């Protein structure tokens, strides 16, 4: 039944990719459930995905980063709940940078221990998708079909440093850690979009993506169910790790639907450094 959901998301990717080329990117006079100003394209993509996913017979409910509450289907005995961010990084569209859709498939309830598959779609010069179950499989659309490019695997140590959050709000220990990576020769690669930045680390073999607790966002900014848990699942299946600085991401509890957390994703070497600094 998972394959039904993945196939539906593949179909959705083609439609969303088309919408991105034709739909207005102007801001609306509305704010989503996470407190972000909405673009017209955010609303259109969210509406499309919600209708598409709620019609799947194996889906009991869905929840979107754009919506306040869980939305239930008529299939009350179905096993799966899908949490998704319909268009992560949509503010980057005007700059013509890559953006994406993030999804997590949960069995029966919304908790990290019930996450059984996850992934993301990246809309850029190429249309690509990563799906994690037993492995993190990488797909690319070639204009006629989706081609399986194989499993992604992180090296033990990488070369990319993608530090999120406003620097003036960082803790001193975090600033020192980021500077130590640059001193080792790590390259700055940060667009402000979670999908392209984490995707680049996976494609290039390793590194560190960080979005720490800051003075203006002590609980972090990124949402557990829609963004952090799905990417943590992908990274672990690719041989990496994800932590909030103290605990493994996929061991965290969820206080509410839009609960957020500090987060660090990367190769084993970078994760060891994070543990040394934060634990």
Curated annotation (Swiss-Prot):
Cofactor binding mode and count: Binds 2 magnesium ions per subunit.
Keyword terms of this UniProt record: Carbohydrate metabolism, Cytoplasm, Hydrolase, Magnesium, Metal-binding
InterPro entries according to UniProt: FBPase_C_dom, FBPase_class-1, FBPase_N, FBPtase, SBPase
Major location (coarse): cytoplasm
Cysteine disulfide partners in this protein: none
Pfam families cross-referenced by the UniProt entry: FBPase (PF00316), FBPase_C (PF18913)
Protein name, per record: Fructose-1,6-bisphosphatase class 1
Organism: Helicobacter hepaticus (strain ATCC 51449 / 3B1)
Lineage, opening ranks: Bacteria, Pseudomonadati, Campylobacterota, Epsilonproteobacteria, Campylobacterales
